[in-house]
């Protein structure tokens, strides 16, 4: 889908329609599509908090987007949204300028698209260019050519390409039998500056068991290639998908952070059928209960994002029953024990080598008290308080061998800890 999501179509229904109609893209034969020889120059400077399902570009609607704590619209909006987005300090992923194979196959039209890119590349609201949604492996050559075209004419802004989840109904393998291979082929072909995917786990007929596996595979690919990744998080219901609870939406956000996400994209903000209460905002402007939930979570993300953005992901571990594709907390690691429920723990380092731990309650329905033992005596254990946007001292008991801390977490919530220097 290039452009705004229609009210009755989801990413997976659009894919089914495309396959049913045989809308496979032809192999690339675009003019001026030779691969650029310069490296990708774009690097993320802020933590992305974006939406899919863009509202019409009207002042009251964009004001609502900004008030909910978003800083970007990642939905291939038209150029008419740029000035309005800038008014509300929003960035946009630009679409609707002809960045598609059919248009670029005509030399005159390709020149017009290049002119459009040059016209908008210095706009302060421009975040990047929308190129592909739920990309099939058979589309990689086309998507790569589109990405090259955009990158040649504007190397300072990334292309936004959404990838399929590992359990897509066409098969996790798509054409190869291996989702990791699908990711590798995509990265080699398109040379993206970022990875985006959507794995929507909350389903009417049983939740997905492959959510953490998908996060892990994306995480590995992102680390191997030095790319940030931005998962699309489920904030709505549609046929086959149930509405997530507040705890589940918090769980989505914090588990993504634990795995090293450098931003998130909430779906679906706008475009659900009127009266369905399936999205965040209805077509008549009615705010559903999920608007307040997302706004609260975005406030946390705006506070945590600048702290997490420069940290280097080191490892991710689980306690309790280990989900598919996850790694169990080792017995003899940095953490000696983690009690109180099932948890996800993301381990990070800053530029100076200081260890950080993001501890996430894997129970999305129940608040828990965490008892955490660090296998070294730590001087100055601290936690980051999103409401104060500051580090605070974490109460801790220290002996010769361990540091033990206790704290509470809401359903699906997390706490970022910074370990001080060892005292021995």
Q: Where is each model-derived feature located?
A:
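Short, basic, low-complexity termini and linkers enriched in Ser/Thr/Gly/Pro
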Residues: 1, 6-17, 23-27, 423-424
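Glycan-processing catalytic domains of CAZymes
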Residues: 34-379, 385-421
